[in-house]
Amino acid sequence: VDKTRYIAEVERNASFFFLIRPRRFGKSLFLNVLRWYYDVNRKDSFEELFGDLYIGSHPTPEQGQYLVLDFNFAGVNPDPDELIRSFNDHCAARFREFAYYYERFFNPGFREKMESLPNADEKLTYTISEAKRLNLSIYLFIDEYDNFTNAILANMGEKHYKALTHGTGFFRYFFNKLKEGATGDGPIKRMFITGVSP
């Protein structure tokens, strides 16, 4: 089923989407379509990628206009002893790929500096700062944002869950940094986050 007709609706209706649906609903597939559609490095492949689909003959103004930063938190280990390391490892891999893939848009040394930063928060802060300074636009995707937190809630209880997601919890802090990058003249111009409905 061609779901590319929904791209224009997403673009028209809001800059920040939060989609909660049951498993097997097609959320991840739709995110992949959006990633490829908006990626500035794939702009010249539009006809090849989308030519036979609805959006191929109905492109939107923002097609191919963004640096795409994406995360899939399904890959984060929910074991409390491994969680922070696993989260930082996942994010480090995503930031490494982002820095390599979009290196030409940044000043020399961007990738090396990114590699040297010790955790997800610092990598995110650096990315936001550099993109803002260079007037670059980022489309941020997070698939299964609630995957490991739901596992912790189910297996460890509300106390552990709140320690991560409330107050000074590291996951809360990470989302506060995202919010900072998406407000005012921040470089995160669009965001699409998916989760699983209970």
Predicted regions and their residues:
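Phosphate-binding site recognition
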Residues: V1-P198
